[in-house]
Amino acid sequence: MKKYLALALIAPLLISCSTTQKGDTYNEAWVKDTNGFDILMGQFAHNIENIWGFKEVVIAGPKDYVKYTDQYQTRSHINFDDGTITIETIAGTEPAAHLRRAIIKTLLMGDDPSSVDLYSDVDDITISKEPFLYGQVVDNTGQPIRWEGRASNFADYLLKNRLKSRSNGLRIIYSVTINMVPNHLDKRAHKYLGMVRQASRKYGVDESLILAIMQTESSFNPYAVSRSDALGLMQVVQHTAGKDVFRSQGKSGTPSRSFLFDPASNIDTGTAYLAMLNNVYLGGIDNPTSRRYAVITAYNGGAGSVLRVFSNDKIQAANIINTMTPGDVYQTLTTRHPSAESRRYLYKVNTAQKSYRRR
């Protein structure tokens, strides 16, 4: 009964699905994959609701790691935005034992997203000698957690001192919550600085922009997935941005999921796409600040949608932008772009980039 939710149906789609991200290139197969993935994720959410109850659906996202085990009766949820780790179970027998096991595995898991299936209850989390959360969490004595002994002792402390329960219908949900260290975001970002610097030099893209995109897209969560199947730290989509980058590099096809879940490959691909937006798709914009605003917005909603804000003719759109001040371009994109998400995206990335430039 390992595949209690019949999620074996999802496995083939997980290999090839894509999303409506970051580009204007679409094809029929991509649309079918995206729609199919969305339908199956809706079914996944429905089945989780059947097991956990109304308003208890938690699914992995760009800034949320969620892993179910124990026939979907136990889950680990890392909220990378809020900096909290919540371990919960609805197991009817020995709930503390289920929680203890999940706490230890979550604290000691590695940083290889390609080895973990977030859409099944398979216990495929391996304990790592260099845990992904090392330094982002400290135990009750204020020490970082690297080894199983310390993780086990901390789990025992949590179960004794922080165990909570709540009722949802006939179900009792037991949980413990762990707060990450205040600078957990910086701790994660630091893991990838070398990769960011390498990609920055390779493609001529500012390090601060790459970091700001990563923060906004995934909060530096290497396990990041979206309901529309954008993948990894920079939320790259296989059949749009990924395909464009591969084509520009003389490669056929699209990057695989495992390729995009590799942090170095993801950062390289995402940065290559930023360079394409800057140098090719939006290269007709003269002012570098105006072009940066356009590139940021295009990374979220596509270059075509950015240019159409100014004119349906792409050349004319660039000419119009070139008559405007950078401030006017920013104001236009944050107020007139048809996508509310893209309007907010420019504000978020621009704000984050300023903070990285000050460091």
UniProtKB/Swiss-Prot annotation:
CDD domains to which the protein is assigned, alphabetical: LT_MltC_MltE (cd16893)
S-S bridge residues: none
Pfam family, one: SLT
S-diacylglycerol cysteine lipid attachment residues: C17
Name this protein carries in UniProt: Membrane-bound lytic murein transglycosylase C
Gene Ontology molecular function terms on file: hydrolase activity, acting on glycosyl bonds; peptidoglycan lytic transglycosylase activity
Record function comment: Murein-degrading enzyme. May play a role in recycling of muropeptides during cell elongation and/or cell division.
GO BP, one annotated term: peptidoglycan metabolic process
Organism: Shigella dysenteriae serotype 1 (strain Sd197)
Primary subcellular site in the record, as a coarse category: membrane
